[in-house]
Amino acid sequence: MVWDEIEQGKFIDGLSGIDNIVVRTVKLKDLNGGMIELLEYESHPQPLETLRPIVDTGVSHFAMTVDNLDETYRDLLDMELIFNAKPAISPDGNAKVCFCRDFDGTLIELVEVLN
């Protein structure tokens, strides 16, 4: 994790198009410079009526590879992301995998390639 900050003010208001918005921004960076950004709109929470099932139509989740899934899992747990289960090794032994949900309930598949 390279950034975990609360952002607010004119710049964020202008960028989002919403006045008085407060955003928690978390940035995760891998060793090769790849980055993912997670946003939580703290000033404008939206209730999650139901979480989308993984078999729903449309984009149900996105996947990303990580270098060390156990470390990533611990870091994301510390940021209070919700996981379906702990990381597990695939039946073929080629990958360690788990699913979590971001602050808005979007499913994220995390994969560590083992072989």
Task: Give the label of every model feature segment.
Residues D30-G34, E40-L107:
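Vicinal oxygen chelate
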Residues I18-R24, D102-E109:
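Short, structured secondary-structure boundary patches
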Residues L110-N115:
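Short beta->alpha transition motifs characteristic of CBS
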Residues M1-G33, D78, P91:
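Core segments of cupin and vicinal oxygen chelate
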